């Protein structure tokens, strides 16, 4: 394994930290991997414990990822990917505007806000995983963004804005579950092929939007 411990800031802007064969274990006061920086564990896992993690226009990838960033994650125009396993993130705000967040297995996010919006169609962030499970104390902003799960999609947030965006769960078993104070799906798409679709919402705005359940189980809407 490759281990790096720094009490203060780690500046990897435009640089590379590569582990070609083993794992990569990083701990720092903050980490700046922007401006084309690369954090890569080609055949192993990558763990990161830091304050603010800035991956804007950077690349962070490994077979599996575990990230704890107490002051937030910035991934604008960045790429953050677990190539062969799970991507588990615990943070404050996660800014993925124009960025990509991926996992072959589970993508788990515990945090405050998740910002995945764009100014126009095609400009939002992109999220894709085998399974998605978000638990947010604040809002999930997905205006013109995209969240797509190959199996289940579970989202819990204070509010979800999917106006002009897309939320999709493609698996034929399991469930899609959204729990939020409100869902704005104006001109957006919420599509689930899972057996069950469960929407527990304080309010729902769906003007011009589409909610589609093609599974053979239960479609439940509490609002």
Label each region the model flagged.
Residues 1-7, 18-29, 41-51, 61-71, ...:
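Surface-exposed loop/turn motifs in large extracellular/passenger domains
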């Amino acid at each position: 394994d490759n281990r790096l411990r720094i009490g203060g800031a780690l500046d990897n802007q435009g640089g590379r930290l590569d582990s070609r064969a083993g794992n990569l274990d990083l701990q720092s006061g903050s980490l700046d991997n922007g401006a084309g920086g690369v954090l890569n564990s080609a055949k192993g896992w990558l763990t990161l414990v830091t304050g603010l993690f800035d991956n804007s226009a950077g690349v962070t990838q490994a077979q599996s990822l575990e990230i704890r960033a107490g002051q937030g994650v910035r991934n604008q125009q960045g790429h953050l990917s677990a190539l062969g396993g799970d991507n588990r993130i615990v943070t404050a705000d996660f800014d993925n505007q124009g960025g990509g967040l991926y996992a072959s297995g589970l993508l788990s996010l515990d945090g405050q806000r998740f910002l995945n919006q764009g100014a126009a169609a095609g400009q939002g962030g992109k999220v894709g995983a085998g399974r998605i499970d978000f638990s947010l104390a604040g809002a999930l902003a997905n205006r013109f963004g995209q969240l797509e799960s190959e199996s289940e999609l579970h989202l819990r947030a204070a509010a979800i804005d999917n106006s002009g965006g897309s939320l999709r769960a493609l698996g034929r078993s399991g469930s899609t579950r959204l729990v939020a104070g409100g869902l704005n799906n104006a001109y957006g798409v919420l599509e689930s092929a899972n057996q069950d679709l469960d929407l527990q919402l304080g309010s729902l705005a769906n003007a011009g939007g589409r909610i589609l359940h093609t599974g053979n189980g239960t479609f439940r809407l509490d609002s």
